[in-house]
């Protein structure tokens, strides 16, 4: 077994353990049973839930200012949003074809200005739909079709070192931050800036990890202060 596979499995195991610890904290805090059993995995945003409170939680732990919130292929993304023709070409150029690595993608200055503007306009016109996919419910290939997943209601930033909650917000709180903001395009990334000038998300080409994940669309979320 390769060291990459082994470390990936360990990370998943550690993550599940931390979700269990947070579930206990939330149960003690609210007096209502929270659990991470029967949820999680690569096709859901839900890490912890409480049926009695109708709370469906995504747990985030970040050592820095941001952490991954969504990872998907351009194929799944474009299929979900029914993107084709010139706009589809931009996605193939900016992120590169699957498994082509950094050498297979183009940067903003290497792409036609009209295509870049087409893409930026699309992200801003569809900013709430983009938010729903990357934060609220995801988009996953199931039974041969790309469908949205089950929606979360809350996001919690959890400090794995101290086993304490840093911040808990509702998805609607995050959605309201998005409504007044906009996407901007840089040479190799897109950034989302809210109405107060704070960076909330960025989108980059995944360049690390196994070849099968390279050239994927990797979204990061910034911790709410």
Show which residues each predicted segment covers.
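Nucleic-acid endonuclease domains
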Residues: 1-45, 49-52, 59-225
């Amino acid at each position: 077994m390769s060291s990459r596979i082994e470390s990936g499995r360990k990370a998943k195991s550690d993550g599940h353990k931390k979700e269990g610890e947070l579930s206990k904290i939330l149960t003690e805090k609210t007096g209502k049973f929270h659990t991470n059993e029967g949820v999680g995995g690569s096709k859901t945003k839900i890490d912890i839930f409480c049926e009695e409170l109708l709370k469906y939680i995504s747990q985030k732990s970040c050592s820095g200012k941001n952490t991954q919130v969504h990872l998907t292929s351009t194929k799944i993304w474009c299929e979900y949003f029914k993107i084709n023709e010139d706009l589809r070409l931009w996605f193939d150029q900016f992120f590169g074809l699957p498994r082509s690595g950094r050498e297979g993608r183009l940067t903003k200055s290497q792409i036609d200005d009209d295509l870049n503007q087409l893409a930026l306009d699309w992200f801003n016109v569809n900013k709430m739909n983009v938010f729903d996919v990357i934060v609220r419910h995801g988009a996953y290939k199931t039974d041969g079709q790309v469908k949205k997943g089950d929606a979360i209601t809350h996001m919690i930033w959890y400090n794995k070192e101290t086993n304490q909650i840093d911040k808990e917000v509702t998805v609607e709180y995050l959605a309201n931050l998005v409504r007044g903001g906009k996407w901007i395009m840089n040479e190799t990334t897109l950034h989302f800036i809210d109405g107060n000038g704070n960076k909330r998300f960025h989108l980059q080409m995944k360049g690390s990890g196994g070849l099968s994940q390279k050239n994927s669309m990797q979204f990061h979320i910034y911790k709410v202060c």
